[in-house]
Amino acid sequence: MTRKSRRLILIGAGLGVLALAAGLILTALNDTIVFFRTPTEVAQQQIAPGARLRLGGLVEPGSVAKSGASVRFAVTDGNSKVTVAYTGLLPDLFREGQGVVAEGVLQSDGTVKADSVLAKHDERYMPREVADALKKSGHWKEGEEGGPVPPAAKTPGPQSSAAPPAVSPARSTP
C-alpha cells in the first residue's frame, strides 16, 4: 500500500466517523426539539396526537374557564382557535386578549394539555409567526410602537386610590 492510498483511507474513515457522529447528534436533538405553532397551523397540519408543541397566540376573550387548580382557555391567532387545558398556577400577567405561549402535548380531541403557560410581559411583543397570522386575518392593530394592541390592553387598569402627595406650605421666617 502506498502512502497516498493510506492517506485517502485515513481521510475517508475520519469523514465517515464525523458523519456518523453528526447523524447521532441530530437524531438525539430531534427527540428534544419542540416546534412553535400557531392555532391555524395546528388546525391545518396533520399533527399526530401525543406530539409536543408550543402554541402561541392571544387568549380568546370569554374563553377562560377555571375549575379549582385547573383552567381551560382558547388560544387564537384570529383565524383558528385551539383549546388549552392547564393545571397549576397561571402567570400574573395572564388575562383575556393577552399574548400567551402554552407548551404541552396535543391530545386526540385537538386540545393541548399544557405543562407550562407563559404570558407575554409586553402586549406589543408577539412572535413573528403569530404576528403574521394576525396581519393576514385582519386582527392586527397598530399600537404605539407598531405592535398589536389586544383588547385587554385597551381598557384602563385600576386607578390608584392613593392621594397625591401633600405639598407642605413654605415657612416664612421673621
Curated annotation (Swiss-Prot):
Positions of the UniProt region annotated as Disordered: 130-174
One Pfam family named in its UniProt record: CcmE
Low complexity composition bias: residue spans: 156-174
Keywords, sorted A to Z: Cell inner membrane, Cell membrane, Cytochrome c-type biogenesis, Heme, Iron, Membrane, Metal-binding, Signal-anchor, Transmembrane, Transmembrane helix
Binding site for heme: 121, 125
Periplasmic compartment residues: 29-174
Subcellular location: Cell inner membrane
GO molecular-function term, one example from the UniProt record: heme binding
Stretches assigned to the Cytoplasmic side: 1-7
Principal location listed in the UniProt entry: membrane
Record-stated family: Belongs to the CcmE/CycJ family.
Protein name: Cytochrome c-type biogenesis protein CcmE
Organism: Azorhizobium caulinodans (strain ATCC 43989 / DSM 5975 / JCM 20966 / LMG 6465 / NBRC 14845 / NCIMB 13405 / ORS 571)
Lineage of producing organism: Bacteria, Pseudomonadati, Pseudomonadota, Alphaproteobacteria, Hyphomicrobiales
